[in-house]
Amino acid sequence: MNKPITASTYVRCLSLGLIRKLSDFIDPQEGWKKLAVAIKKPSGDDRYNQFHIRRFEALLQIGKSPTCELLFDWGTTNCTVGDLVDILVQNEFFAPASLLLPDAVPKNVNTLPSKVTVVAVQQKPKPLCGKDRTSVISDENPEQNYVLPDSSSPENTSLEFSDTRFHSFSFFELKDVTNNFDERPISVGGNKMGEGGFGVVYKGYVNNRTVAVKKLAAMVDISTEELKQQFDQEIKVMAKCQHENLVELLGFSSDGDDLCLVYVYMPNGSLLDRLSCLDGTPPLSWNMRCKIAQGAANGLSYLHENHHIHRDIKSANILLDEDFTAKISDFGLARASEKFAQTVMTSRIVGTTAYMAPEALRGEITPKSDIYSFGVVLLEIITGLPAVDEHREPQLLLDIKEEIEDEEKTIEDYVDRKMNDIDSTSIETMYSVASQCLHEKKNKRPDIKKVQQLLEEMTGS
């Protein structure tokens, strides 16, 4: 017979079946991230940093459960069921906590998930440690929520955006202008430009104008309901925010098999691609990099002035037009906040882990998290290195800050040598700005206006 589970039972001694049951509760809506950031070392420091969380996240791509792998890993430290239940209760995971120690759950709470919306998902892999999962759409800050209309009813096919300046395309039109969403890369004569967590981008031609068509598609662990929310949010933000340094949305389609967004085409791709010299493009000069940094800061400043937090600032989301003018893109995760100076909490942790501020990993939504992410982008601009590389030491680019502060290296050791117009003084200045943006404590980071000022002083513009 199996021994009864007590608070002193080691997590590593739990049966695989029980761990699978726990993962069924914790995997949806990335609850495992909340669990991971709550786990501490005996010293009180975080056990898991951004890189660890990114690795757990990557397990979804091969059909594994992050919760299972997290518990397997943490279990090697001789943590107990009592330790686990404490964290579960603190984060209001009452149902899985009651599976382990029913008496540890407060008597006045319901251990069944409340306000659950079960939604269909497309192409969702089956986790190797758990059953097929449904997404739980949680009731976040009610002032922040925007209720989507029922897109299945004919009168709501425009998703209530008929009063915006955007053109409503038919799905058939977009299929036609993208050669039936030709999946072949542009380099071999197809239309596919790239893909991300929320869809695939295709090159198309509308009235002799080149456009970029993003067809939203449920990737790993993203439900169709979340996809609709991304679509809705992107249009809402774009309707309110127009600026030289924000990408321009031309229209959308919501009448077909997939939701689509149509943008002005950016011929020079993303900052990420140009820094890596993708497809043999020449390296960006230092002067050009400074211009791009200032443009991106201007775009972010406009968003913050208009009470929007982007939540996914990264080099892949900074696009470049024919003049290499920076255009911030991808507003599907953006949040509007009337109480902009205050921190808002969310049960849904989103963003790209290698760029995420410590508080963002805890579910806080604050403009200072955008500042932190922008600090990582500035390091990419200086070094030409990607934000994360598992074959590099340090693997996370933001960790070079520690090496420089410990005087093991200087920023000169990391400067991208592909540039032929290196200016040591302005590089030091940009690194100083990046370092301030990357302060662990959000209140110690500069606001975007200060960042703008420092970058302008750097170039004398």
Swiss-Prot record:
Q: Where is the Death domain?
A: 20-104
- Record keyword DNA-binding present: no
Query: EC number(s) per UniProt?
Result: 2.7.11.1
The record's listing under Pfam families reads: Pkinase (PF00069)
What cofactors are annotated for this protein?
A: Mg(2+)
Similarity-based family: Belongs to the protein kinase superfamily. TKL Ser/Thr protein kinase family. Pelle subfamily.
Q: Which PANTHER family match?
A: OS01G0750732 PROTEIN, SERINE_THREONINE-PROTEIN KINASE-LIKE PROTEIN CCR1
GO CC annotations, alphabetized: cell surface; cytoplasm; nucleus; plasma membrane
Describe its PTM? Phosphorylated.
What binding partners and quaternary form does the record give? Associates with MYD88 and IRAK2 to form a ternary complex called the Myddosome. Once phosphorylated, IRAK4 dissociates from the receptor complex and then associates with the TNF receptor-associated factor 6 (TRAF6), IRAK1, and PELI1; this intermediate complex is required for subsequent NF-kappa-B activation. Direct binding of SMAD6 to PELI1 prevents complex formation and hence negatively regulates IL1R-TLR signaling and eventually NF-kappa-B-mediated gene expression. Interacts with IL1RL1. Interacts (when phosphorylated) with IRAK1. May interact (when phosphorylated) with IRAK3.
Q: Keyword check for Acetylation, yes or no.
A: yes
Q: According to the UniProt record, list the residues that bear Phosphothreonine.
A: T343, T346
Which named protein is this?
A: Interleukin-1 receptor-associated kinase 4
Q: What is its main location?
A: cytoplasm
Gene3D superfamilies listed in its UniProt record: Death Domain, Fas, Phosphorylase Kinase, domain 1, Transferase(Phosphotransferase) domain 1
Q: What class of enzyme is it?
A: transferase
**InterPro entries attached here?**
DEATH-like_dom_sf, IRAK4, IRAK4_Death, Kinase-like_dom_sf, Prot_kinase_dom
Show the taxonomic lineage.
Answer: Eukaryota, Metazoa, Chordata, Craniata, Vertebrata
Instruction: Identify the keywords attached in UniProt to this record, alphabetized.
Output: Acetylation, ATP-binding, Cytoplasm, Immunity, Innate immunity, Kinase, Magnesium, Nucleotide-binding, Phosphoprotein, Serine/threonine-protein kinase, Transferase
- Catalytic residues, per the record, are D312 (proton acceptor)
Protein's gene: IRAK4
* Modified positions (Phosphoserine) in chain numbering: S347
Species for this entry: Bos taurus (Bovine)
List where in the cell it is found. Cytoplasm
> What catalytic reaction does the record list?
L-seryl-[protein] + ATP = O-phospho-L-seryl-[protein] + ADP + H(+); L-threonyl-[protein] + ATP = O-phospho-L-threonyl-[protein] + ADP + H(+)
